[in-house]
Amino acid sequence: MTAQTMTLGYARMGKRRELKKALEGFWSGALGSEALLATFWDLETQAWQTQLQAGIDHIAVGDQTLYDHVLDWATWLGLIPSRFRGLSGLDRYFAMARGREGLPALEMTKWFDTNYHYLVPEIEPEADPSPNFGDFLERVRRAQGILGERTSPVVLSPVTLLCLSQRSGDLRADLEKLLPLYRDLLQELKQLGIPEVQIHDPILVTSQGSGLREAVEMSYRQLATAGIPVHLVTYFDDLGETYPWVVQLPVAGISLDFTRGHTLDLVRTYGFPADQILGAGVVDARNVWKVQPETVLASLRELQGVAPNLRVQPSASLQFVPHDAALEAQLPEPLRNVLSFAEQKLAEVALLARALNGEDTAAQQAEIQQQWQSFAQFSPPNPQVRQALANLKLQDFERFLPYEQRLSRQVQLPPLPTTTIGSFPQTPEVRQWRAKYKRGEVSQAEYEAAIDAEIAKCIRIQEEIGLDVLVHGEFERTDMVEYFAQKLEGFAFTEHGWVQSYGSRCVRPPILYGDVVRPQPMTVREFQVAQSHTQKPVKGMLTGPVTMLNWSFPRVDIPRREQALQIALALRAEVADLEAAGAVMVQVDEPALREGLPLKKERWPEYLSWAVDAFRLATGGAKPETQIHTHMCYSEFGDIIEHIERLDADVLSIENSRSNNKTLLQIAQAGYRHQVGNGVYDVHSPAVPSVEQILQQLRTGLAHLPVEQTWVNPDCGLKTRRWEEVIPALKNMVAAAHQLGEELLETQPEGLRE
């Protein structure tokens, strides 16, 4: 049987971020809704045509979005929180996404283990969904005019939608409300002549999946009554223990991710129904490297022996990679030739299918093999780095003294010491200086003088506010990963390699392609400038190895653990240079530590083992007198607290203001012994917290954690705030800390416990 091809979604925002510009123009009032929608429709059409020209047989439709595809489905299903029901159309859609005066936005969180963020639907107890699929069906009709029978509508599964939502009701009861709406939609698609519908159900690959059997079986039984073939799509991992019953669901086909987990082993063990289509996700939709055709073809031929009706496809939507590697003319040719962005992945899918179908693709395969050989010559292993890793000993991952003995050797501060997380407002003037320097319009000396002036101003303001521990402000940094990656060998940078993070926000992840080497100090100059303006301690500021790795496109030729340890060695040398320059405190931030957790809990220990090891390697060489800080901006610590403690950071600052002290309580209940920076106010809000509000937050915190363990800080960096918001907020924070400190000295100097 002839193998076909399919896509599950395509790159977003446009090659030149056209949708980002249109959205921000619309939000600012410079662009009308008609112009915004025209831009969106044009980009959506371009995506279809690109896939059509690549020869894809089944092309995803409905995956593109103005803001977020989960928000789209909540809107189409009529799952509108009551606070937004007075609005309609784009006003309501963007209010749900971004909030407006008196109307808080939906919560935003990570889409599984990717770096994309989705908006969390809110399903109120008495919700009575009132669907409107007009927009979705219009997209399908437009696609049919271009793609014909290749049109493959993408529908987010009701089970996945509910599992990702905030809801208080019973899953089965909520599902019974939604399933008739889904069935009606499928019947409308059938009437349009759609040959097959993709139902995306990624929740099945998570640890939750095994407990959802009853709900999933009920869903697909009811959806089957619509009379249109359903193709169940999973991605991001293997199905694990759910595999044997998922493949028995009443569906026409099932798509599986063969690039993560152990999917091929599951097929070998349990087989696959001969009468179903197997969507083989063999082209990795989340990395940027070309496949090795001979290896993938061997797997595809084995699969074809089990499932004759086979489709070759990316492992997931291509929204997680940039549009076109051919645009990156500035990259060295050997590197560029082995990169595969969305357009190149379409070509890879088509090539693999042609080869599987017996066409002569030997010349193309030989060319790819030659490109990889050229790349290997361009980026050979670095013997010094490999030897340094081989020479690592257990003591390299440990501080010289345990925490209790380090504590007395470190800088002594008043009770409830105050500090910030690191960044301060980046004004238009600062961004202009960086842009001019990048374009070569100002010299390095002129640029550094401008940055130094900002650092001096920042130090002066912090001293006037009365903070105990200062930071230099990070004015030279555009991004906490890109800044360091640009100073390390082994990372490459794109000009057009943007991917959507959320809404109009795009990120341009560095590409980790070779062994990591630090040619020279990365942060010492700015630290010295800052420290020269004050007698108070200034923290050195670094991004941790796991965050550097998780927010980049990693290599595929060596394990992630090895890549993290290489980065850690570079950071270890930076910590030593900061100490030599006079730093007595160094902060190594790891906001992405938790984000990298595998989707299956049984795989957490392996990941956390090397992730913690990487942090300990980066910081283990620090002198006992050097206080190591780390910051983690998420609110769920309970299930990984033992690993947080194993980091052995002297001070852990947390995001606590929006969690009702839940984070602090988790830490206290676990018996965490190290110092904790209580994030006492929400930097994501422009509102200036009052002294009384911060006092309340601190008093609540001290009911769980003793004063000698407590630091006081905002819950995250201040980069996106304005000075007129930052200064009064920090003044109130310092005033609250001083007031409470004086009260404690008078009454209970040893602190309070619950």
UniProtKB/Swiss-Prot annotation:
Binding site for 5-methyltetrahydropteroyltri-L-glutamate: 17-20, 110, 505-506, 551, 595
Pfam families: Meth_synt_1, Meth_synt_2
Gene3D superfamilies xrefs: 3.20.20.210
Domain of life per record: Bacteria
Coiled coil: none
GO biological process, one term: methionine biosynthetic process
Residues bound to Zn(2+): 631, 633, 655, 716
Reactions this protein catalyses: 5-methyltetrahydropteroyltri-L-glutamate + L-homocysteine = tetrahydropteroyltri-L-glutamate + L-methionine
Keywords: Amino-acid biosynthesis, Metal-binding, Methionine biosynthesis, Methyltransferase, Repeat, Transferase, Zinc
Active site, renumbered: 684 (proton donor)
Cofactor mode of binding and number, as noted: Binds 1 zinc ion per subunit.
Pathway(s) where this gene product acts: Amino-acid biosynthesis; L-methionine biosynthesis via de novo pathway; L-methionine from L-homocysteine (MetE route): step 1/1
Enzyme class: transferase
Gene Ontology terms for molecular function: 5-methyltetrahydropteroyltriglutamate-homocysteine S-methyltransferase activity; zinc ion binding
Binding site for L-homocysteine: 421-423, 474, 589
Function: Catalyzes the transfer of a methyl group from 5-methyltetrahydrofolate to homocysteine resulting in methionine formation.
Protein family: Belongs to the vitamin-B12 independent methionine synthase family.
Name listed for the protein in its UniProt record: 5-methyltetrahydropteroyltriglutamate--homocysteine methyltransferase
Species this protein is from: Synechococcus sp. (strain JA-2-3B'a(2-13)) (Cyanobacteria bacterium Yellowstone B-Prime)
